[in-house]
Amino acid sequence: MGCDGGTIPKRHELVKGPKKVEKVDKDAELVAQWNYCTLSQEILRRPIVACELGRLYNKDAVIEFLLDKSSEKALGKAASHIKSIKNVTELRLSDNPAWEGDKGSTKGDKHDDLQRARFICPVVGLEMNGRHRFCYLRCCGCVFSERALKEIKAEVCHTCGAAFQEDDVIVLNGTKEDVAMLQTRMEERRLRAKLGKKTKKPKAAESVSKSDISEEAPGPSKMKAGKPEETSLDSREKKTSSAPRSAAAHGSSSGKAGKPVCGAPKRSIADSGESEAYKSLFTTHSSAKRSKEESAHWVTHTSYCF
């Protein structure tokens, strides 16, 4: 029954029960949230950005995540809600003057104070180490403690003076309830942005169609300054001159000689009041008529034979 040496095993040593849930050290969890990038798990270094859920990232890690097209990208669930660089905001952090960094523990003879933070609240002076709630503004990226926003109520930023609304305040590394609330606000914000884009497209199309119609529509005719009698006479002369031209053009296009206008009277140069010198240019003049003796030989071809 016993083992060597006379020992008897007990029940709790032989029967395996349920494993105890391992408790995470709160200090280690806070250090991981406030000092390391959520995506790459590297130490936070400027420029530092935050998403709409209040998580901290290195900006270069976010850019690499967006540029990565491989299948391993699906593993980054912590940044699955980041679709573009516009979904993150670069933070304006205030340095802690008491922060020594790695200089104090280079020899290993000093204690590392995990409660000492790199950044502080510029209004109250609280250290951003996770013991106090901090938030940032989406409009400008300035970071404050929640106590500062509650004690000094204002509608403008305490640092840069930019106006903000309650929807622009996002809690950094909040609780599960805070993350759920920020998730709903993010979805509503993106839905409003999509609806705004859809309403802008038909408005732009309507403006383009109206401009085309205004260009094609004839404008009001403007009368030139002058006497009404002169304008009416000019219009009549233009109409009469355009009529024979159109008739001639129609005849030439059809290939047949255009017929003279029936209304146009025939006139003779002999009956006109022109000078004798002008009339002598034509063959119908008396000086152009010759007798048979003066006429040329029948072989000679001249216009006078006809």
UniProtKB/Swiss-Prot annotation:
It is found in: Chromosome. Residues 192-306 are annotated as: Disordered. Residues 241-258 have a biased composition (Low complexity). Keywords: Chromosome, Phosphoprotein. GO terms for biological process: cellular response to hydroxyurea; mitotic DNA replication termination; regulation of DNA stability. InterPro entries: Rtf2, Rtf2_RING-finger. One of its GO terms (molecular function) is DNA binding. Belongs to the rtf2 family. Undergoes proteasomal degradation, via DDI1 and DDI2. Removal from stalled replisomes and degradation are required for genome stability. Residues 226-240 have a biased composition (Basic and acidic residues). Replication termination factor which is a component of the elongating replisome. Required for ATR pathway signaling upon DNA damage and has a positive activity during DNA replication. Might function to facilitate fork pausing at replication fork barriers like the rDNA. May be globally required to stimulate ATR signaling after the fork stalls or encounters a lesion. Interacts with nascent DNA. This is Replication termination factor 2. Transmembrane segments: none annotated. One of its GO terms (cellular component) is nucleus. Pfam families: Rtf2. PANTHER family: PROTEIN C20ORF43 HOMOLOG (PTHR12775), REPLICATION TERMINATION FACTOR 2 (PTHR12775:SF0). The keyword Phosphoprotein applies. Residues 192-202 have a biased composition (Basic residues). The modification Phosphoserine is found at S287. Interacts with DDI2; probably also interacts with DDI1. The lineage of its organism: Eukaryota, Metazoa, Chordata, Craniata, Vertebrata.
